UniProtKB/Swiss-Prot annotation:
Organism: Acinetobacter baumannii (strain SDF)
InterPro entries (alphabetical): HflD, HflD-like_sf
One Gene Ontology cellular component: plasma membrane
Protein name per UniProt: High frequency lysogenization protein HflD homolog
Keyword Membrane: yes
Main location per the UniProt record: cytoplasm
Length: 244
């Protein structure tokens, strides 16, 4: 049985729980976008904070988890830990319809690339987790990395940890076509540490996509239920900021 990092006193409803997992995917793709465009040293402390939280979650998400008992917040400490993902997700689903949607969350400039990466990850996750060989690779890597952390003072952003996460992505989702093509600073892509960080971001998104699907998420439902999804995001925002 998987030992979950956090246990919540109050559970979200089914839709909110699923929406929060999807926000985790978008948090990963927003960090992928930020890293690719600005470089690994430029995403700031807040970016590293959100990234570390995703890594922790991705190492605990398992394909054998009891879906009925799992809550997205079992893998995070609080709603604020996925606030970047909530902002990104809301921006992505409202931007096509209006230039100035009403929102309780601050808007971001561009949603096109994070949205593209997220949709690709949702498709890749289904293919990865339908292949027992890829699932075994992920589970083996999770166990290896969790053991390694003790040697690196639990530094989830240590280059060796990121390199292992990146390699896990390459060995699984990276073997499936069409591959995700990340746009960014061409010169920075020559740096192995930079590309490892991007691939590690994508791996965390892959894992959050798996959690989302475990919770009943489907691409078709997301496409045709955008209004309900937006309502769920706004409800989560009210819970996060205690808006009355």
């Amino acid at each position: 049985m998987v030992e979950l990092p956090f246990q919540q006193s109050q559970a979200l409803n089914v839709r909110q729980n699923r929406a929060l997992a999807l926000a985790g995917v978008f948090q990963a793709t927003q960090l992928t976008h930020m890293t690719a465009m600005t470089g690994q040293q430029s995403i700031g402390e807040s970016g590293n904070f959100y990234f570390e939280l995703l890594i922790k979650a991705s190492l605990n998400i398992r394909p054998t988890t009891n879906n009925n008992a799992v809550q997205t917040l079992d893998f995070f400490n609080q709603l604020a830990d996925i606030s970047l993902g909530l902002k990104t997700l809301e921006n992505c689903i409202t931007q096509p319809f209006t230039n100035a949607p009403k929102s309780r969350l601050p808007k971001m400039r561009s949603a096109k690339l994070p949205m593209s990466y997220a949709m690709s990850l949702l498709q890749l996750e289904k293919k990865v987790y339908s292949n027992p060989e890829y699932v075994a690779i992920i589970e083996k890597a999770q166990q290896k990395i969790l053991k390694q952390l003790s040697f690196f003072d639990n530094n989830y952003l240590h280059p060796s940890i990121l390199a292992n996460l990146a390699q896990t992505y390459v060995d699984t989702a990276g073997q499936i076509n069409p591959r995700i093509l990340v746009r960014g600073n061409a010169e920075a892509f020559k740096d192995t540490n930079h590309t490892n960080r991007i691939r590690a971001c994508l791996f965390t998104g892959l894992q959050m996509a798996h959690l989302w699907r475990q919770l009943g998420g489907s691409s078709w439902n997301m496409i045709f239920s955008k209004r309900k999804l937006l309502q769920d995001i706004q409800a989560l925002a009210r819970l996060q900021y205690q808006v009355i």
